[in-house]
C-alpha cells in the first residue's frame, strides 16, 4: 500500500473505530464503519442490535440504510443508487459477517477495508469468501477486500466488551462488570 494511502486508511479506520467506541459505550458489540465516496465520508454506522432488539442491525446495515434513505430522498432511481454503491469504499473495524458481506456483494460495493478478522462469522475470507463473487451468488458482484488495518485497536475494543460482560446476552450469563467511562 502506498504511504499516502496507508495514512488515509488509518484516518478512515480511526473514524470507524470512533463508531465502534460509541457502540461499546452503548453496551453493543463494538463494531463501527464508514462509507466513502471520492475520499469523503458519506455515512457511518455502529452496531445497534441490542438497542433495536434486531439482530440484523450491524454497523454496515445501519450505514447502508442511511445511504439508501438519503439517496431515495434525493430522488435517485434504483440504477442510480446501484451506480453510487459501485463507487463506494467501506472501512469497518471487523471483517464483515456473512450477512453483511453478502449484502455488500449484492450492492456491488467497490472495496472493503477491515480491522480484525471475524473467525466465527467472517464473510470476506475467514469462513466464506463472498467478496470474490460467483455465479452461485445470485446477482452478487465481487469486491476488493483487505484486512488487518488497525486490527489491534479493534481487538482491544472487543476485549473490553467481553471483559465487561453483555447485560443483553441470554440468561444465564456471567455478571456484568461496571467500568469507569473514559
Swiss-Prot record:
Its EC number is 3.5.4.33. Belongs to the cytidine and deoxycytidylate deaminase family. ADAT2 subfamily. GO terms for biological process: tRNA modification; tRNA wobble adenosine to inosine editing. It comes from the Eukaryota. The active site is at 60 (proton donor). One of its GO terms (molecular function) is tRNA-specific adenosine-34 deaminase activity. One of its GO terms (cellular component) is nucleus. Zn(2+) binds at residues 58, 97, 100. It holds the Pfam family MafB19-deam. CDD domains: nucleoside_deaminase (cd01285). Involved in RNA editing. Catalyzes the specific deamination of adenosine-34 in several cytosolic tRNA species. Generates inosine at the wobble position of the anticodon loop. It catalyses: adenosine(34) in tRNA + H2O + H(+) = inosine(34) in tRNA + NH4(+). SUPFAM superfamilies: Cytidine deaminase-like. This is tRNA-specific adenosine deaminase TAD2. It is an enzyme of class 3 (hydrolase). Interacts with TAD3. Disruption phenotype: Embryonic lethality due to embryo development arrest at the globular stage. Keywords: Cytoplasm, Hydrolase, Metal-binding, Nucleus, tRNA processing, Zinc. It comes from Arabidopsis thaliana (Mouse-ear cress). It is found in: Nucleus; Cytoplasm. Residues 7-135 form the CMP/dCMP-type deaminase domain.
Amino acid at each position: 500500500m502506498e504511504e499516502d494511502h496507508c495514512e488515509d486508511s488509518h484516518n478512515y479506520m480511526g473514524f470507524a473505530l470512533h463508531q465502534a467506541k460509541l457502540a461499546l459505550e452503548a453496551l453493543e458489540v463494538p463494531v463501527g464503519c464508514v462509507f466513502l465516496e471520492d475520499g469523503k465520508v458519506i455515512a457511518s454506522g455502529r452496531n445497534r442490535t441490542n438497542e433495536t432488539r434486531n439482530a440484523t442491525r450491524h454497523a454496515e446495515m445501519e450505514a447502508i440504510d442511511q445511504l439508501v434513505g438519503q439517496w431515495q430522498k434525493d430522488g435517485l432511481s434504483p440504477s442510480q443508487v446501484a451506480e453510487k454503491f459501485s463507487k463506494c469504499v467501506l472501512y469497518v473495524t471487523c471483517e464483515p459477517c456473512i450477512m453483511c458481506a453478502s449484502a455488500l456483494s449484492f450492492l456491488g460495493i467497490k472495496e472493503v477495508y477491515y480491522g480484525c478478522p471475524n473467525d466465527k462469522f467472517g464473510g470476506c475470507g475467514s469462513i466464506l469468501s463472498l467478496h470474490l463473487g460467483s455465479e452461485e451468488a445470485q446477482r452478487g458482484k465481487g469486491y476488493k477486500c483487505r484486512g488487518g488495518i488497525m486490527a489491534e485497536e479493534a481487538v482491544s475494543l472487543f476485549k473490553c466488551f467481553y471483559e465487561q460482560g453483555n447485560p443483553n446476552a441470554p440468561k444465564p450469563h456471567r455478571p456484568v462488570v461496571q467500568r469507569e467511562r473514559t
